[in-house]
């Protein structure tokens, strides 16, 4: 029989516990959505970000980023622009983001942290201010925790203990966080990951999403409008394996 579009209960529960243990985020099972790798989670996230509002068809990348994410935007008919993190950090980064957001065309902001391939990491001050920008302008923050916990300047390896891995989820409401099993657990072959959807935006309704994928509520648009029409969910085998990890 087919796996549930939004994931098996075992992985949703294990994912919720993992997120609490290492990111100190409190979410429910319904906010944990297994995908066929983080790339699928990012693909659906970008599709929704570019269609939450009319005329916001641009994704802003904090570069360098995994090149395939830009190819995804092109495939989706979205415009891609970037800010090079080598040149902009701290307040300079925030001011540059604000300049791009001011044109009213940005639907989503996407980054990876630790960054693939530069290994740079956004700090909590930057994350807090990016969250404020996204919440104020109803922009979707797409956070790819690509090499999760692999910033070895701090020890993030002890569950349920500080320090916790920095995440946009501690500061904002309009976010999706992607966690890759390929990198976190050296589990690339079966193509499995989890997307954590902000409890706030999960329930939010967008008339433009209704026009785009027949689902007005954001969470339904992700699982039924995105996962169902692309891969009909993620395989049972991969989900059970990841849940055990």
Please annotate each region the language model reported.
Residues 1-137, 142, 148-172:
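Conserved core of the PLP fold type I
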């Amino acid at each position: 029989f087919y796996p549930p579009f939004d994931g098996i209960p075992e992985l949703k529960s294990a994912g919720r516990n993992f997120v609490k243990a290492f990111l100190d985020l409190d979410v429910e099972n319904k906010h944990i959505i297994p995908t066929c790798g983080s790339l699928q989670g990012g693909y659906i996230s970008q599709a929704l970000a570019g269609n939450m509002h009319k005329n916001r068809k641009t994704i802003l990348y904090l570069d360098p980023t995994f090149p395939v994410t830009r190819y995804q935007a092109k495939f989706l008919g979205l415009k891609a622009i970037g800010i090079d993190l080598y040149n902009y950090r701290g307040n300079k980064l925030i001011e540059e983001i604000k300049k791009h957001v001011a044109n009213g065309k940005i639907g989503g902001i996407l980054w990876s942290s630790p960054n693939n391939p530069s290994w740079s990491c956004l700090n909590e001050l930057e994350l807090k201010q990016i969250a404020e920008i996204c919440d104020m302008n109803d922009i979707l923050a797409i956070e790819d925790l690509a090499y999760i916990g692999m910033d070895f300047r701090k020890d993030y390896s002890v569950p349920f203990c500080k320090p916790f891995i920095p995440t946009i989820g501690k500061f904002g409401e309009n976010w999706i966080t992607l966690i890759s099993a390929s990198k976190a657990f050296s589990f690339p072959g079966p193509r499995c990951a989890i997307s954590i959807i902000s409890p706030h935006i999960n329930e939010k309704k967008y008339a433009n999403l209704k026009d785009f994928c027949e689902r007005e509520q954001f969470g339904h648009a992700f699982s039924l409008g995105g996962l169902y029409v692309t891969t009909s969910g993620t395989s049972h085998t991969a989900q059970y394996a990841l849940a055990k990890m």
